[in-house]
Amino acid sequence: MSTLALVAFVLWAAFLRYLPKILNFLRLQRFAKTLPGPTIGELIANVKKGEILNWLKELREKHGPVFRIWFGKDLMVMFTDPEDIKQLLGNNQLLTKSRNYELLEPWLGKGLLTNGGESWHRRRKLLTPGFHFRILSEFKEPMEENCRILVRRLRTKANGESFDIYPYITLFALDAICETAMGIKKHAQLQSDSEYVQAVQSICRVMHKQSFSFWQRLNVFFKHTKPGKEREAALKVLHDETNRVIRLRREQLIQERNEWKPEAEQDDVGAKRRLAFLDMLLLTQMEGGAELSDTDIREEVDTFMFEGHDTTSSAIAFALSLLSKNPDVQQRAFEEASELEGREKESMPYLEAVIKETLRIYPSVPFFSRKVLEDLEVGKLTVPKGASISCLIYMLHRDPKNFPDPERFDPDRFLVNEKQMHPFAFAAFSAGPRNCIGQKFAMLELKTSLAMLLRSYRFLPDKDHQPKPLAELVTKSGNGIRLRILPRDENGTTA
């Protein structure tokens, strides 16, 4: 075969290989022309300004409940109407996360958050029993212990002067999740300069920066940059520590199992000590009930660490900010927290409404995205294979049809009007088959921590401060959460 013929053959083979992708991309372009949406220049300009959420809000007002955005060669169709979101989140076939979640894979691997398809189904079925309320109730004690440390640390700030409370909250959340997820005390609140604490903060910071940076998404280049090297160093610390704890906890479980009396095995497990999330996975592995490698276990523990740390920190901090500006709401929440002290596992209607209203205004996860693997019917649209869809929760929660005067903080919406809302008007924990597996855990931690903080302090606003929510992997305030606090006495009053 001549050189020319060989070159022609290679080019023809390459053409045939990429022809389906080319044809599908052309189909995506034709579909995109039927929907309104911004130019790539507008996207880049708003990313640089860091005002994605405000911009998306403007796009919703300009284009209506459905519009499209090109992220490079990736087409994303945005949905904000509760009926469309019901169709999307309730779809049992639409389970594959979009490319946005690939940013998390270096840390979380193919854990429950990033996985899809049959592998996700098996893992979800395996993990669900670990979030039974009876088991979750065991986690309340370490939540309280770590919140007491937070209360003590805040005493130095209880002088009525403004400060940023977010760093205090995030270290508390890290301590609480380390103890419930891995069964170890990290003392992040007391040793914030430890290697592990620094690594968690570093990886979250780098991933957040990557989330809306085009060039930082290209791993082939990113890994050679300073942030890329920072990420790799943090990953080594995090993975090494999780692997170390897995080995340690397995040895402890084997030793305890050897000491159990066969006829009392069930009771002795609970009597000896509280089981962490990691322990439950290790016991499943040891009993051979499912194929779980140490890497599988590490991925799920790291996933639990990420989801239970960043999202909880955001929710607590925003809740305290809103309560500081709404003293009547804060007083009602304080009275309920005082009346039900020690009974946070029970229903706390008003505090739960406060949490829901906080998550309505500042949802910890501002949007949920999925990859469309087959043509998808949504209302009157047919979204073509190869596109992605995004449920814009931040916009959904501001729909005046379900939430009149949507920027107003009003927990009574969830006490008086909740039954009148569209069932998918509020989706802070997602919904359908891929809803948040840890939402009961999150609510227990939020109720426990907020109740303890409200019983200890009165929260006052910094009148010069207004949080600037940023749409990163988790909604955060770009300028911190500044407020003032005063201590309460035994009667719940302040000086």
UniProtKB/Swiss-Prot annotation:
- Return the Pfam families for the record: p450
Where heme is bound, by residue?
Answer: E307, C436
Q: Which GO terms describe its cellular component?
A: endoplasmic reticulum membrane
Heme among keywords? yes
The protein's matches in InterPro entries, at most eight in alphabetical order, are given as: Cyt_P450, Cyt_P450_CS, Cyt_P450_E_grp-I, Cyt_P450_sf, Cytochrome_P450_Monoox
Keywords, comma-separated and alphabetical: Endoplasmic reticulum, Heme, Iron, Membrane, Metal-binding, Microsome, Monooxygenase, Oxidoreductase
Q: What is its main location?
A: endoplasmic reticulum
Task: Name the Gene Ontology molecular function terms of this record.
Answer: heme binding; iron ion binding; monooxygenase activity; oxidoreductase activity, acting on paired donors, with incorporation or reduction of molecular oxygen
Report the protein's function.
May be involved in the metabolism of insect hormones and in the breakdown of synthetic insecticides.
Q: What is this protein called?
A: Probable cytochrome P450 4s3
- UniProt organism field: Drosophila melanogaster (Fruit fly)
